[in-house]
Design a protein with these regions (language model features):
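Acidic, low-complexity mobile loops and tails
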Residues: 1-31
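Short, compositionally biased
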Residues: 42-48, 73-92
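Short, solvent-exposed beta-edge and connector elements
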Residues: 6-12, 35, 41-48, 65
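Short, acidic, Ser/Thr-enriched surface-loop or helix-capping motifs
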Residues: 7, 44, 54, 225, ...
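Ligand-binding clefts of soluble mixed alpha/beta catalytic domains
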Residues: 83-604
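Short hydrophobic beta/alpha edge segments that flank linear recognition/processing sites
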Residues: 21-42, 61-77
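Exposed loop and linker-edge segments at protein-protein interfaces
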Residues: 16, 22, 51-54, 59
């Protein structure tokens, strides 16, 4: 019979059996202490204890016999997974909750919405959701793990611990990691029901922790940014102004490295708005207000007295380009955020192609008739995959994320409904930033061209047009992603070159529809400028107009898509119905070049 031996040098703390007792296999016989930690020594098999060789307090050596035993086959063995004692053989459901766990559960419950019904009801009365409701909707079911849930406001010197636990849960910032579309994402939400969603010292620490994890592990970030900025009431920290806080620099450092999504509902002012402005994309509800200072700051600066809803309403912030996607409510904002992230989570196989022949009808037969270029975007993108960005700003160029043949891409298209498709400063800014966004995150770009060129004239030059439109050339020159161009109708001058990444031979291909026409400048202007002498020689009236029409017809023919293809200035003239085939083949042929250094995306 093998006697029970000590597995290490230790001290006997307690015998759980007496001589003559029978024990089952895996039952605890004695407690030993070593290095201030207690070890349970179990019976290797069913046995009867005949003699205890050491008393409590005695020191035993490694492998020394602790007690004499003899076989006791009739003693039932405890199952291996029975727990640490006979008492633990009870089922987990029946076992009482330990005191330490009970304290944790009670404390954790205070962080949940159920513990604050009045605050939740007030939120719902405003037509808004709580921070936790938004995060639960954003993340796949049961995937969110929360960091820093037990934090409270740094106000212990002026408020009781119980008060802080009940009224400043998570210090007004819910942070963690969850999965969106089955891929990990850092998710953070300011809690507007806690101190108006202001930025406290503890929630800055929590934010910094999550931003570090996002950067280190290359995780996308979603921020619900509602709140009132800095919090002066945190008095536990021995600081004066708090301008050393690293949150803003850490958040900005994510730019171009991971997708960063900002969501605004309700009031988003000051520091909260500064973080929102660093995001790749801003999704905002119609009732939102976004501004670098709320009413108190505006009034304090002697700038007047305003209500919150008068500062940065969505109608202003969408038109000026601050808001990328305007939605009705937070539920729609979350749905858009999930859709936006999906473009950076790889290709899809559940592709539904739009009707091919529909593209043949997009451009009117009358070359002077305007049309909606978004129909062309709809015609090349997989069904249901279009997400337009900044649709209320820079309306001269449409920008959208989409999929073509399952591959995520960025789409640009001139808008003939605005200035005939001419590119003005806002449109150029919008297009250049969109190129940077797609380039940073590896999305190929597809350009649908119909432009008479850059907008000109004294009023236009007053907008710094020269600088703004040149952004398109600079952004395109630094692209590492494939660029594919299709000229639908007008391809004139420098504007057409800017829409084709700097020139018709810069893209992977520049194809044209039969409706396309080309020239170094607008054809009408080219005739008036190049044939001024001939036109002036003819009397003003029907005769001069007839000559003008004749000369214009020659220019249109000379600048036709077919003629351009014969001189190899473009790569092909294609049936519009074959556009998706060309794009899909091109996307399959081209590679995304490795990123050299860190990409950046302008905030504007």
């Amino acid at each position: 019979m093998k006697h029970l031996r000590a597995p290490l040098q230790s001290r006997v703390v307690q015998w759980l059996v007496s001589p003559g007792a029978s024990v089952g296999a895996n039952e605890v016989v004695v407690i030993l202490e070593a290095m201030k930690m207690e070890h349970e020594i179990r019976a290797p098999s069913a046995m009867r204890i005949t003699e205890l060789l050491f008393a409590p307090g005695d020191v035993v050596q490694d492998n020394e016999v602790l007690c004499l035993c003899e076989p006791a086959a009739a003693v039932a063995a405890l199952p291996e997974d029975s727990g640490h004692s006979k008492a633990a053989a009870q089922t987990h459901d029946a076992a009482p909750v330990r005191a330490d766990l009970e304290r944790l559960l009670a404390r954790a419950a205070l962080t949940q919405d159920a513990s604050r019904p009045e605050a939740v009801a007030k939120r719902h009365t405003l037509g808004l959701r709580t921070a936790r409701e938004n995060l639960a909707d954003l993340c796949d079911a049961n995937t969110f793990i929360e960091y820093g849930a037990l934090a409270v406001a740094a106000q212990r010197s002026r408020r009781s611990q119980e008060d802080l636990e009940r009224h400043t849960p998570a210090d007004g910032m819910v942070t963690g990691i969850g999965r969106v579309n089955e891929q990990p994402v850092v998710a953070m939400a300011y809690d507007a029901t806690v101190l108006a969603g202001t930025q406290g010292m503890r929630n800055h620490q929590k934010t910094d922790r999550m931003l570090g994890l996002a950067l280190q592990n290359k995780l996308p970030v979603v921020l619900f940014a509602e709140g009132g900025g800095g919090r002066p009431g945190d008095v536990d920290m021995p600081i004066v102004a708090g301008l050393h806080v690293g949150t803003f620099a850490s958040f900005a450092r994510l730019n171009g490295q991971v997708p960063v999504v900002g969501i605004a509902a309700g009031r988003c002012f000051a520091g909260n708005a500064a973080l929102l402005g660093c995001c790749d994309v801003i999704i905002a509800t119609r009732d939102s207000n976004i501004g670098m200072g709320g009413p108190a700051m505006v009034e304090g600066g002697g700038l007047g007295v305003f209500k919150p809803e008068q500062i940065g309403p969505s109608s202003v912030q969408q038109a000026n380009g601050v808001i990328d996607v305007l939605v009705d409510d937070e539920a729609q904002a979350v749905a858009v955020a999930r859709q936006y992230l999906s473009y950076f989570q790889g290709p899809r196989t559940d592709v539904v192609a739009p009707p091919e022949n529909a593209l043949r009808e997009v451009v009117p037969q009358n070359r002077l008739r305007v049309y909606d270029a978004r129909d062309a975007m709809q015609g090349v993108a997989d069904v249901g995959s279009l997400l337009h960005l900044r649709s209320g700003f820079g309306v001269g160029i449409h920008t959208a994320l989409a999929r073509v043949g399952g591959r995520p891409v960025g789409l640009l298209a001139n808008n003939p409904l605005h200035l005939g498709g001419a590119i003005d400063a806002p449109a150029a800014d919008k297009a250049a930033r969109f190129m940077q966004l797609c380039n940073a995150h590896g999305l190929p770009l597809i350009s649908l061209v119909d432009t008479p060129g850059f907008m000109v004239g004294p009023d236009t030059e007053a907008t710094a047009q020269v600088r703004h439109v040149s952004r398109m050339f600079v952004a395109a020159a630094h692209l590492r992603v494939p660029y594919l161009s299709v000229v639908m109708r007008k391809g004139y001058g420098l504007g057409a070159m800017a829409m084709t990444a700097g020139g018709f031979h810069s893209p992977l291909f520049t194809a044209a529809w039969p409706t396309a026409e080309f020239g170094a400048m607008g054809l009408e202007g080219a005739v008036r400028l190049g044939f001024r002498k001939e036109l002036d020689a003819v009397p003003d009236g029907p005769q001069r107009q007839a000559l003008f029409e004749e000369l214009l017809a020659r220019q249109v023919d000379n600048g036709s898509a077919i003629h351009m293809a014969t001189t190899l200035e473009i790569d092909a003239v294609i049936d519009p119905a074959q556009t998706r085939h060309w794009l899909i083949t091109g996307l399959q042929s081209a590679k995304v070049a490795p990123l050299s250094g860190v990409a950046s995306i302008d905030t504007w």
